[in-house]
Regions:
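Post-signal peptide N-terminal segment of secreted/secretory-pathway proteins
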Residues: 70-103
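Active-site beta-strand/loop microenvironment that shapes enzyme catalytic pockets
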Residues: 272-290
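Soluble non-cytosolic domains of exported or imported proteins
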Residues: 53-56, 73-84, 195-196, 280-284
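Extended substrate/cofactor- or partner-recognition/assembly subdomains adjacent to catalytic sites
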Residues: 92-272
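Solvent-exposed, polar/charged alpha-helical surfaces in well-ordered, non-transmembrane soluble domains
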Residues: 60, 64, 77, 81-84, ...
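Acidic/histidine-rich, surface-exposed loop or edge segments in extracytoplasmic proteins
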Residues: 57-75, 107-109, 179-188
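N-terminal Sec-pathway targeting helices
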Residues: 1-16, 24
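N-terminal, intrinsically disordered, polar/charged segments of Gram-positive cell-envelope systems
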Residues: 26-57
């Protein structure tokens, strides 16, 4: 990444912030309306790896999130921008109930449920980036913005319904933006490919509750405005089932099928071959494009 580009992005992020707060009210009606309180909140964090629930201050939790979501050698400005997005996401997520119903906690350490959390990877620069933006969040209409972010857009970002299969009304602050060629993103996120045997697919999909017997076919049935996969039909010896693109990607391991912005998607001779570009859901901040 270029330090100049990161400074510009951070500047744009700061311009978007319409309120600077330290705390949030997490219960009652209109709980995600921005409020300024007197003390830093304490979060309850469900540790998916061990099943325990830990308490920690918001800013300490965010340092672990930034460490889990970014590389350890990026400039402080990049960590600062990421901290604002992560803080905004956390504020909004917890205000809407977090994972209370599932774990009895505010957040979890699952990247699929909330955000990555890797405290052992925290560096001094990461702590600086979090501290220099302490309490800063993005808001829209005096409410916390769900600060979505992903690793690399593949050249174009998506809106929430397309990239995440977001079930609520499309947020007005998410936009699809076409971006210039990226000279900083590594090749493994700019162009990737993966293969799955029919047996692998059967096991992976069954773990997600998709049971159609032996896999006989997988096909894209719908793409969104940015050409990301939005719907997939899985065919098997015991029937067929439709899945959303984001749901399918999570089922087959989102570190292998890096995005739903695919160029090739073909099932032949018992093997599904996929190639594409980008890493992540494509909504919000694209870290490598920053």
């Amino acid at each position: 990444m270029a330090r100049k580009n990161q400074a510009v992005v951070l500047g744009l992020v700061l311009v978007a912030i319409s309120a600077v707060v330290l705390l949030i009210s997490w219960s009652g009606d209109d709980s995600n309306i921005v409020r300024e309180l007197e003390e830093e909140p304490t979060l309850t964090v469900y540790m998916n790896e061990t099943g325990e629930i830990k308490e920690m201050k918001l800013e300490e939790y965010l340092a672990g999130v930034v460490a889990g979501e970014m590389f350890p050698d990026w400039p402080v400005e990049a960590y600062a921008a990421q901290a604002i997005f992560a803080r905004s996401f956390t504020m909004d997520f917890v205000s809407q109930g977090g994972v209370k119903d599932k774990y009895g906690a505010d957040v979890s350490t699952s990247i699929e449920e909330t955000q990555a959390y890797t405290p052992q990877a925290i560096t001094d620069d990461i702590r600086r980036g979090v501290e220099m933006t302490r309490g800063q969040v993005m808001t829209y209409d005096n409410r916390y913005v769900r600060g979505w972010f992903h690793a690399y857009s593949g050249g174009i970002t998506a809106r929430a319904k397309e990239g995440l299969d977001y079930q609520e009304e499309e947020p007005p602050f998410t936009k699809s933006v076409r971006l210039p060629e990226n000279e900083y993103a590594p090749e493994e996120v700019k162009a990737w490919q993966v293969e799955y045997s029919a047996a692998e697919l059967k096991n992976l999909l069954a773990a997600r509750g998709v049971n159609v017997g032996d896999i006989t076919g997988v096909e894209i049935t719908e793409r969104g405005p940015t050409e990301r996969i939005t719907k997939i039909l899985v065919k098997g010896t015991q029937g067929e089932q439709e899945m959303t693109g984001p749901e399918f990607r999570l089922a087959v391991d989102s570190t292998k099928m890096k995005s739903t912005l695919v160029r090739e998607f073909a099932f032949a001779d018992g093997v599904l071959r996929i190639s594409g570009t980008g890493y992540g859901h494509g909504v919000g901040l694209s870290q490598w494009d920053a």
